UniProtKB/Swiss-Prot annotation:
Gene3D superfamilies to which the protein is assigned, alphabetical: Globins
UniProt function note: Leghemoglobin that reversibly binds oxygen O(2) through a pentacoordinated heme iron. In root nodules, facilitates the diffusion of oxygen to the bacteroids while preventing the bacterial nitrogenase from being inactivated by buffering dioxygen, nitric oxide and carbon monoxide, and promoting the formation of reactive oxygen species (ROS, e.g. H(2)O(2)). This role is essential for symbiotic nitrogen fixation (SNF).
Protein name: Leghemoglobin-3
Entry keyword set: Cytoplasm, Heme, Iron, Metal-binding, Nitration, Nitrogen fixation, Nodulation, Nucleus, Oxygen transport, Phosphoprotein, Transport
One annotated GO biological process: nodulation
Residues noted as binding O2 in the record, renumbered to the chain: H61
InterPro entries assigned: Globin (IPR000971), Globin-like_sf (IPR009050), Globin/Proto (IPR012292), Leghaemoglobin-like (IPR001032), Leghaemoglobin_Fe_BS (IPR019824)
Length: 146
């Protein structure tokens, strides 16, 4: 079974909720660093700070990550696959030292953040929609990391 219209709608609505509160970006990176403190140096906007502090770069990067997952949901529904819009993503991830376990950390942080953002609208179906879209995006990025 392919990615459904309903799954795409679930991702889109929670994406809109995510964007409405800048604190969601801070939460996302806080969860990442709780799971993988060494990842701090991979993010230019975090490496010289004492902790996760809100900044325009942090907001921009978080919105980019969540937005790419949202775009992946749209691609999955439309075509059944994900093609990266930015051909440099693989090289950037290699340059930053990203390895396979990092994708699992980001996935966990993304899903926990979406659960928090969604509040009483959260469901297993919503979680699965984000999970499937993220996994497809992560697979596309990993393929580009050559």
């Amino acid at each position: 079974m392919g990615f459904t219209d309903k799954q795409e709608a679930l991702v889109n609505s929670s994406w809109e909720s995510f964007k409405q509160n800048p604190g969601n970006s801070v939460l996302f990176y806080t969860i990442i660093l709780e799971k993988a403190p060494a990842a701090k140096g991979m993010f230019s906007f975090l490496k010289d700070s004492a902790g996760v502090q809100d900044s325009p770069k942090l907001q921009s990067h978080a919105e980019k990550v969540f937005g790419m997952v949202r775009d992946s949901a749209a691609q999955l529904r439309a075509t059944g696959g994900v093609v990266l819009g930015d051909a440099t993503l693989g090289a950037i991830h290699i340059q930053k030292g990203v390895v396979d376990p990092h994708f699992a950390v980001v996935k966990e942080a993304l899903l926990k953040t979406i659960k928090e953002v969604s509040g009483d609208k959260w469901s297993e179906e919503l979680n699965t929609a984000w999970e499937v879209a993220y996994d497809a995006l992560a697979t596309a990025i990993k393929k580009a990391m050559v």
